[in-house]
Regions:
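The feature marks helicase ATPase cores and/or their adjacent C-terminal helical subdomains
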Residues: 1-625
Length: 625
């Protein structure tokens, strides 16, 4: 043990047996995985895709929660996605251990939500400011439009856009070298909107940094409150975030334990256009999990060609290994790019039975690309530049969790989309809670329900104890809808919400009539065996004209599928400075280059994309004329 407060917690073989039985699904941990679960030192775990990293972490958390001796000190689990939280809810959500993990005194959430909740929000409020909205895209646009036309025109000529309207690096600084009147105007707009309660995500981290630097006691309090820290997907933590973590947990091995779980080959961060090579993970002496249980040795061998780590991944034989599946590269001419999607759809139908496609429906078949946001028309030499050049109906922002909607019903509809996509009811409740928060704050005409990492919990917090049970029941009733919302159904749901609003001493007024009104939904439907079903955003239905068999293919960025498992994946050729496959094709060959050069981020993105599929992996390549 490294710290005295955790000495009495020892993970035994009996604990391992208990957690295997608790998790079910024929979970069994070999000696390598058992040693990781038992390890209570500050150490990192380099885990290759499909090695069961998240399951190992969930098992460890379950044992710790069962044996946790403190009422006011907790376990802290940070990540960049909610995959760990989702797995806890799926595996342990129905028992006491799961409920313990997901509630006080423990914290399981994103790095952003942690620093918002425990550092930035209290710090900003101590300055006399309220927080009404944290959203980079919306807030930057709001600030941009408050600048005069002349100022915006000048900035555009300097190749600046809305992103200039946010603090960068530290509080009070923006990404503009020149001082003068223009910079002063931007800073004035930022300051005024912050006084109104509007902040970007990155600004919240900057305020957290400011607080940690100015008040030494914050780090001591955090480590006292959370003596053990787990970082899931640690490789996606950028240099600025590592700096924050090391300021907050500045006595690692003395006052707290830190364990990072991740794969250095998948360090793709969030911005393709920013080079941020962090050497913080894995630390020296890391434990290695190199056996993938997602796919067999054929896919492992293909993915290893674009891996940057010295260690190599091993595959595991699965139910698809004997089928001699034809992993494929589609070679196409530029004018035939959309046809690649149909060829992929046909290959899926030729490879898998309808029973197999149905059995793995939750994992699904996916088309992914490195570039997916369209900023301008694609020049001929750059075609295909992004996913949108293969399928013009692709909408990169369609299901963004940070989206601010004009109408309440849109939050409910996106909640249904999330549930249909993932099967996770908690994601639907998250969307509903966002909508209810906006409804209540509009009605109260103030920031009555503050922003937090868990909006549902924030809604509960402002209610008296004797109203919370009724509120939970009403949210449960509202989240019971899994299909399209009809106009009559919406009116019925509004009846429930009117009763709910009474708990907050609110009655429906003209101020919120516009927000809660019914609006029509886009009509995207598909005929399937006489049944008409709703097509989710960014889903393409391929139909075999001869057999009338169909397959649902989902489109998305490489970043959006990180941490997920697919039945089949097609990785598209896209353009960022050069065509992706053109730049990395040599690494896929028998004798790869000795030097990676400037291809680190490109190779990591390709590695993430090529390690999603459990059965069928496809690439495409534009044909050179």
């Amino acid at each position: 043990m490294e710290i005295d407060r955790l000495k009495e917690i020892e993970i035994t073989d009996e604990d391992i047996q208990w957690v295997e039985e608790t998790l079910g699904h024929e979970v069994h941990f070999d000696s390598t995985r058992v040693n990781i679960i038992k390890n209570m030192y500050s150490v990192d775990i380099q885990a290759f895709p499909g090695s069961g990293k998240t399951t190992i972490l969930v098992a460890k958390l379950a044992i710790l929660a069962k044996k946790w001796p403190y009422d006011n000190l907790g376990i802290c689990v940070l990540s960049h996605t909610n995959v760990a939280r989702e797995e806890i809810e799926e595996r342990l959500g129905n028992n006491e251990i799961g409920r313990k993990l997901l509630s006080y005194p423990h914290f399981i959430g994103t790095l952003h939500s942690f620093f918002d909740t425990y550092v930035a929000l209290p710090w900003i409020r101590s300055k006399g400011l309220n927080i009404d909205l944290i959203n980079t895209e919306y807030v930057n646009f709001l600030r941009w439009m408050r600048l005069s036309y002349e100022t915006r025109y000048y900035l555009k000529r300097q190749r600046k856009n809305e992103s200039i309207c946010s603090y960068k690096g530290c509080i009070g600084e923006i990404d503009l070298d020149k001082g003068g009147e223009t910079k002063a105007k931007i800073l004035d707009v930022i300051e005024k909107t912050q006084k109104e309660g509007y902040f970007t995500f990155d600004e919240m981290l900057l305020y957290a940094k400011q607080a940690l630097e100015e008040l030494d006691g914050i780090s001591s309090s955090i480590q006292q409150r959370f003596p053990i820290l787990f970082i899931d997907e640690a490789q996606d933590t950028d240099s600025f975030q590592w700096d924050l973590l090391e300021k907050a947990f500045n006595k690692d091995g003395i006052c707290s334990i830190r364990q990072g779980y991740g794969d250095s080959n998948q360090a793709i961060y969030n911005n393709l256009y920013v080079d941020d090579e962090s050497s913080h993970f894995p630390r020296e002496g890391a434990l290695v999990l190199n056996e993938s249980m997602r796919f067999d040795s054929r896919i492992a061998k293909l993915a290893n060609t674009v891996a940057l780590s010295k260690e190599r991944m091993d595959g595991t034989e699965n139910v698809f290994s004997e089928g001699k599946i034809a992993h494929t590269i589609f070679l196409f001419q530029k004018d035939k790019a959309p046809q690649v999607i149909d060829e992929f759809g046909q290959l899926i139908l030729n490879t898998f039975s309808d029973k197999e496609i149905s059995e793995y429906q939750k994992e699904g078949c996916h088309v992914v690309g490195m570039v997916h946001c369209k900023k301008e028309d694609t020049p001929e030499k750059q075609f295909p530049k992004g996913i949108y050049d293969y399928w013009e109906l692709y909408e990169p922002e369609k299901a963004s969790k940070s989206m601010v909607h004009k109408f309440l019903i849109q939050y409910f509809r996106y909640g249904i989309i999330e549930f249909q996509r993932s099967g996770e009811r908690s994601l639907q409740v998250e969307w509903i809670s966002k909508g209810l928060r906006r409804l209540i704050n509009k009605a109260k005409k103030c920031n009555y329900v503050p922003v937090s990492g868990n909006i549902f919990a924030s809604l509960l917090k402002v209610l008296p104890d004797d109203c919370q049970t009724d509120f939970r029941k009403m949210v449960y009733e509202l989240s019971g809808t899994s299909d399209a919302i009809s106009k009559s159904k919406w009116n019925s749901m509004l009846g429930v919400m009117k009763q709910m609003l009474k708990l907050f001493d609110i009655t429906i007024s003209q101020d919120i009539e516009e927000f809660i009104k019914w609006i029509d939904e886009e009509n995207n439907e598909v005929q399937d065996g006489g049944k008409i079903g709703k097509v989710l955003p960014n889903h393409y239905i391929y139909t075999d004209k001869e057999t009338q068999r169909i397959v649902d293919i989902e489109f998305g960025s490489i970043h959006s599928v990180k941490g997920r498992t697919h039945l089949a994946t097609l990785v598209l050729e896209t353009f960022l400075k050069t065509h992706n496959m053109k730049a990395i094709l040599k690494f896929l060959c028998a004798t790869p280059p000795k030097s990676v050069g400037k291809n680190q981020k490109r190779l990591r993105c390709q590695y993430v994309a090529m390690t999603r599929a459990r059965a069928l992996l496809c690439l495409d390549r534009v044909k050179l004329l």
